[in-house]
Structure formats: C-alpha cells, structure tokens
From Swiss-Prot:
InterPro entries cross-referenced by the UniProt entry: 4-PPantetheinyl_Trfase_dom (IPR008278), 4-PPantetheinyl_Trfase_dom_sf (IPR037143), P-Pant_transferase_sf (IPR050559)
Name this protein carries in UniProt: L-aminoadipate-semialdehyde dehydrogenase-phosphopantetheinyl transferase
Domain of life of the native organism: Eukaryota
Entry keyword Transferase: yes
Organism the protein comes from: Saccharomyces cerevisiae (strain ATCC 204508 / S288c)
Primary role: Catalyzes the transfer of a 4'-phosphopantetheine moiety from coenzyme A to a serine residue of acceptor proteins, such as alpha-aminoadipate reductase. Necessary for alpha-aminoadipate reductase activity.
EC number: 2.7.8.7
UniProt miscellaneous comment: Present with 623 molecules/cell in log phase SD medium.
Known catalytic reactions: apo-[ACP] + CoA = holo-[ACP] + adenosine 3',5'-bisphosphate + H(+)
GO biological processes: lysine biosynthetic process via aminoadipic acid
Record keywords: Transferase
Similarity comment: Belongs to the P-Pant transferase superfamily. AcpS family.
Amino acid sequence: MVKTTEVVSEVSKVAGVRPWAGIFVVEIQEDILADEFTFEALMRTLPLASQARILNKKSFHDRCSNLCSQLLQLFGCSIVTGLNFQELKFDKGSFGKPFLDNNRFLPFSMTIGEQYVAMFLVKCVSTDEYQDVGIDIASPCNYGGREELELFKEVFSEREFNGLLKASDPCTIFTYLWSLKESYTKFTGTGLNTDLSLIDFGAISFFPAEGASMCITLDEVPLIFHSQWFNNEIVTICMPKSISDKINTNRPKLYNISLSTLIDYFIENDGL
C-alpha cells in the first residue's frame, strides 16, 4: 500500500514548472467505517451540507462510499496543492461537477465504484492550461448477461453494440465500453444529461489484460482515454490530448491508498 508520506514525496517532485497527473484509488472498507466513533469523526471533517447528503443515502454501503469519495477529494487536492484540507474551497459546475475554487491549477474528477472510489487529478503549470478531466471505475457485476444486452441497446452506438454482440467476452467489453462513456461524461461534467449512444467508440471486441489506450476526437476535442484493470474493476481516465502531451504520458501513475492511510492523514493534519 502507498503511505501518505510516499505520496507526498512523489508529488513534491513535480513542484515547479513540470505538469503532473495521477490516479488515487481507495477501497471502501465498511468494516472500518462500521465503528460509530470512526464514522462520526470522519464525517466531522466535511462541511455540514456534505454530511447531510451522505446521511441521506439509504444504504450503509452508499453512505460509506460517498464518505470515502469526499475524504479522497480533500486528500488529493490537499497534498497536490500543499494546502491544508481545511483551507480548500470547492464549487460546482452547472451539472454538479466539483472543482477547486481557490486553486484553478488543479482539474480533477471523482468516481465511485462497487468496491473502490477513485480520483484523477492533473497539476497544471498555469490557469491558461486548465482543462477538465474525467474518470470512471466500472464493475463487471453490472453486466446482466447476453439476454439483457437488448435492454442497453439505446446506450450504445450501432457499431459498439454490434461489436459487443460478437465479443467472445461480452462482460469485459460491456464494462470497458461503460467506463469509456462514463469517463467522458465525467470529463464534460454532464453526467446523465448526455445521450450515451452519441458517444461512439466503434466496434470493440477485445480488452487486453494490460489495459488499453485510445486517442479519439469527440465534439471537436482530441482526447486520450486510458483504461486498466484494478483488481476486479476497470478504471478509465479521459483527458485532452494537449494535457497528455504536456505530462508526456497517456498512463498516469495509479496510487493504491488504504483507508487507514487516509484516516492517518486527517489525524496528522488536525482534522480528527
């Protein structure tokens, strides 16, 4: 597992003029959050409005996953900007996508999966280079079998759907396509307000075990997508090609951060 100090040390190396990008992933550990004292202490690190949204979730799993996502958002923005998490000020776009209001050098995107929450963030050199990014983490458990594919026909383009029908492993291809589409909607910030069938990634029938990268132009913007397995889920990031060119990679480093590391971070920074 990556420790807080190692993450801070790694990020500190990019301070200055060189852009940087990274993916942070945290497992949703309900056994740790089942302790009432721990759950309530972590909740108190969040604004009251965020606490209310979490408590309004019906299931304990959803409350835990949303809490982990909020903590990861604070953690990631804090260690990359060097600001104490209590100094961070967030706002939301017209469709609810969060952004860091007091530091416009740091576009980021959040996603919640079945077992993990994830964050993709980019450290820009200047505000002139600020561009949105997107991330999604998709689970094969959302695939209901070939007999249910017809129910999702309107979600895919004709080429995508035909490729899916011909795939030898339709479960993986379904998960891959879903993560591609969702990462793009996280990039645009439009979410469910997007007609997913209009986002056409073509006929895909294979997803390599080592992951895959794709360069495609959508809505006149050249974009880089990179997808990879993380345990049993597929993580996909979306970023403008201009950002990929500046950071000189289409595969940012992924940091697997334990929930206990996150908790230690807030303790060390007087949040608990």
